């Protein structure tokens, strides 16, 4: 029987994963909080102490640091003398290690964190097990991200848990532990930058960098301009997160944490022009994120309007000469690699909330056309573009998009039809190829009816309301095509 060690701080999906492993005849071992969660779910789980014949000591600081664990993980199964030594020491082979680490980054990001809190959230046993298992990827499966659970189970079922896949998991492990170590170094080397003020002048503020990864705002290289403000940092992070969702040349304009214009194109110049045309008023004083190099042509366009921050993976020398003529504009060079961080957190009074990032992608094949009328190809393209954008707009969010840009954005209203009204009132165009995109389902048919009255012919929304049929009937009445994604994008 194969053996797996499960020890996770992020419990998302661990119960379902453990059940699946049990059904596949894995013997499970765990520690502390993970073990309690699995026991509460009536999963047959053993303590790691049964492997080590040694208790957890020092408030859990020493649990898995034992030859019975690391020998079972590190043994090279192609070497008979390794296996003989295991038999002599009565050590069992470990086939899978599932570990994610103490939440150090989340802990040190809290404004009231103490050094003691930080120290207690430095994981020792977890990285050691991960690195050991990753080193022995030829024989051991190592999982650090909950998003890999489902694929691992499917591969086990289909006998496809091969060395090449285990090697890909190994790379994720060393990338993860590298970022974790960087966060610890950055915290203890006093990586706190005092800002001029916070959201408003009466609020003091500082910026704590828990990572210097070059694909994050914290690790950005500032090429020009004065110090980033508190609001600049938040807006820049929002713009960066959205532009990374796109593969094609894309420009994202953000104002007060909401996109005000998003454009795609055959070139980055064309993409920026589409974003600018989407709302040439709101872009004034905003943040622009671009996922391609800024050249002279684009620099001239950017120079012609007032912008607080421009983000791009590269700027040509000629582009920099143009843009640096404005002394206050901030130019940030950032790697557009997708951030591997799987969680985000928000401070609340007395604590903080932690959740998985809303980065699950839905493809056209995952969606359902709920109406009699099928979308045209242009409508599909408009809906897919809009569906990416709406995830970055404050709820209730309703936006309009065509296949190259947003054309109207309604954000942050307390009722959905109110957001729809704003999006439609501000629309730069409405025609058959413009889609209305909603981040949540329609509780009744009024939004669809309002859209129909203003010429909308395509709608995409999550579905899931007990009154979905009302919206479907309303769409059919007006000959509107409506697609349901099965997934919502609330953003608070």
UniProtKB/Swiss-Prot annotation:
GO cellular component: cytosol
Residues passing through the membrane, by range: none
UniProt source species: Staphylococcus epidermidis (strain ATCC 35984 / DSM 28319 / BCRC 17069 / CCUG 31568 / BM 3577 / RP62A)
Gene3D superfamilies hit by this protein: 3.40.140.20, Methylglyoxal synthase-like domain (3.40.50.1380)
Superkingdom of source: Bacteria
InterPro entries: AICAR_Tfase_dup_dom_sf, Cytidine_deaminase-like, MGS-like_dom, MGS-like_dom_sf, PurH-like
Name of this chain's protein: Bifunctional purine biosynthesis protein PurH
GO molecular-function terms, A-Z: IMP cyclohydrolase activity; phosphoribosylaminoimidazolecarboxamide formyltransferase activity
Keyword Cell inner membrane among record annotations: no
Alphabetical UniProt keywords: Hydrolase, Multifunctional enzyme, Purine biosynthesis, Transferase
Keyword field contains Transferase: yes
Protein family per UniProt: Belongs to the PurH family.
């Amino acid at each position: 029987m194969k053996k797996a060690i499960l020890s996770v701080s992020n419990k998302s999906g661990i119960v379902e994963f453990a059940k699946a492993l049990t059904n596949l005849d894995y013997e499970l071992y765990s520690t502390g909080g993970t073990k309690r969660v699995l026991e509460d779910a009536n999963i047959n789980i053993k303590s790691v102490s049964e492997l080590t014949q040694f208790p957890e000591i020092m408030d859990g600081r020493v649990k898995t640091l034992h030859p019975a664990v690391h020998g079972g993980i590190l043994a090279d199964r192609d070497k008979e003398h390794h296996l003989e030594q295991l038999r002599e020491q009565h050590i069992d082979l470990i086939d899978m290690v599932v570990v994610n680490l103490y939440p150090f980054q989340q802990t040190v990001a809290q404004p009231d964190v103490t050094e003691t809190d930080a120290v207690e959230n430095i994981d020792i046993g977890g990285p050691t097990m991960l690195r050991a298992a990753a080193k022995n990827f030829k024989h051991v499966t190592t999982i650090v991200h909950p998003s890999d659970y489902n694929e691992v189970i499917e591969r086990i079922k289909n006998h496809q848990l091969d060395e090449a896949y285990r090697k890909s998991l190994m790379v994720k492990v060393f990338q993860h532990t590298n970022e974790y170590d960087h966060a610890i170094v950055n915290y203890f080397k006093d990586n706190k930058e005092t800002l001029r003020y916070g959201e408003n002048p009466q609020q003091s503020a500082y910026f704590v960098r828990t990572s210097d990864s070059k694909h994050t705002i914290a690790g950005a290289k500032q090429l020009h301009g004065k110090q980033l403000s508190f609001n600049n940092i938040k807006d820049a992070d929002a713009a960066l997160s959205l532009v990374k969702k796109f593969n094609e040349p894309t420009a994202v304009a953000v104002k007060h944490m909401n996109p005000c214009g998003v454009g795609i194109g055959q070139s980055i110049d064309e993409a920026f022009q589409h974003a600018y045309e989407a709302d040439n008023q709101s872009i004034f004083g905003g943040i622009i994120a671009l996922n391609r190099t800024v050249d002279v042509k684009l620099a001239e366009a950017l120079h012609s309007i007032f912008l607080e921050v421009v983000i791009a993976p590269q700027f040509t020398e000629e582009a920099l000469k143009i843009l640096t003529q404005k002394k206050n504009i901030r130019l940030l060079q950032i790697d557009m690699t997708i951030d591997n961080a799987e969680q985000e957190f928000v401070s609340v009074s007395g604590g903080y909330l932690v959740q998985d990032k809303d980065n699950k992608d839905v493809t056209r094949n995952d969606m359902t056309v709920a109406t009699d009328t099928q979308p045209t190809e242009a409508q599909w393209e408009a809906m897919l573009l809009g569906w990416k954008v709406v995830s970055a707009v404050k709820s209730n969010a309703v936006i309009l998009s065509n296949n190259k840009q947003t054309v109207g954005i309604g954000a942050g209203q307390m009722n959905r039809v109110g957001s729809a009204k704003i999006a439609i009132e501000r629309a730069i165009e409405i025609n058959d190829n413009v889609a209305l995109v909603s981040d949540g389902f329609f509780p009744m048919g009024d939004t669809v009816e309002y859209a129909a009255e203003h010429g909308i012919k395509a709608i995409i929304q999550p579905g899931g309301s007990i009154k979905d049929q009302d919206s479907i009937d309303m769409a059919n009445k007006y000959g509107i095509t409506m697609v349901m994604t099965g997934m919502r994008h609330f953003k608070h």
